[in-house]
Structures are given as structure tokens and as C-alpha cells.
């Protein structure tokens, strides 16, 4: 967060681990605008450090002007460095708040595999119990049907023995084609 006041640039950055407050002062008028350079030659005016570097010697240059230019350039570099540092901190803070999806992929796969394994195990046991129940029901039905069949066979034998003596002789006396059709 940047706040500008009349003569200060205040930058604030607060994170979990360390709060940072930075104050950088700047001048409304830069030092080279406040004073005109006093140079050895009247043709050249010194406005920046580059102009000082182009001079052959610094003998006739005011030391206050040199100090102001150096301080101005240092202040600019410090402000740039602090802003870069704050941008870096803010980017780290933003990236720290983002939860990477990669953190959840493996636990999600583990959950899916464990869940499907438990589901298959429970489904298999349920199917087996249902199969055993159905098998016992079918065995009971088979026993009931066998019992009914045995009763019918016994009834048929008793019924055949009671009417069988007279009717067997009469059926054997008939020709074969009459036994089938009448």
C-alpha cells in the first residue's frame, strides 16, 4: 500500500511473519532545480551526475551541489529498491495465500481408492449374503416340492393298487390302438 503525503512516500506492507513500514522522503523540488550549478565554464550547467562525469575536473564545482546530486540519486535508487522489495513481498504474500492444487491431488486419489475399495468389499459381502439367502430359500422350495412329489407318488401308488387289479386286466385286453385313443 502506498500513501503519498506532501513530502514523504510511505509504503506499508504487512504479512503474517513481519510487518514492514518504509518511509522515503523526497523533495518537491529536486536539488538541481533549487540551485543552478556553478561551473568553471559558463557554457555548461550541471543538472545530473552524468554532467559531473563529463567534466574534466571537479575543481570549480560547488561541493553542496555534488552532495545534493549524489543524495538525490541515492534516494531514487533506495526508493526503487524498496518498491521492488515491497512488490516481491506482496507477491510472496499472495502466493502464500494460494493453496496449491497439487497438495490435494494425492490425498484425493487416496480417498477415492480407499472409498472404492471399501465400497467393493461391502458390495461383495452384501452380494454373498444375498446369494446365501436366496440359496437357502431355493433349497426350502426344493424340499417342499420333493415332499409334495413323494406324496403324489405315494398317492398314485395307493390309487393304482386299489383300482389296479380289475382295470389292469381290462386295459391289457384292449388292442393297443384303443388304449391310446379311448
From Swiss-Prot:
Q: Does the keyword Lyase apply?
A: no
Membrane-side (Mitochondrial matrix) residue stretches: 46-107
Sorted alphabetically, the Gene Ontology cellular component annotations on this record are: mitochondrial inner membrane
Its signal peptide is none
Transmembrane region(s): 108-127
Q: Coiled-coil stretches, from where to where?
A: 128-158
UniProt transit peptide range: 1-45
Subunit composition? Component of the inner membrane assembly (INA) complex, composed of INA17 and INA22. Interacts with a subset of F(1)F(0)-ATP synthase subunits of the F(1)-domain and the peripheral stalk.
What does the record give as the function of this protein?
A: Component of the INA complex (INAC) that promotes the biogenesis of mitochondrial F(1)F(0)-ATP synthase. INAC facilitates the assembly of the peripheral stalk and promotes the assembly of the catalytic F(1)-domain with the membrane-embedded F(0)-domain.
Provide the family line.
Belongs to the INA17 family.
Q: Per its record, how is this protein called by name?
A: Inner membrane assembly complex subunit 17
* Taxonomic lineage of the native organism: Eukaryota, Fungi, Dikarya, Ascomycota, Saccharomycotina
Identify the coding gene: INA17
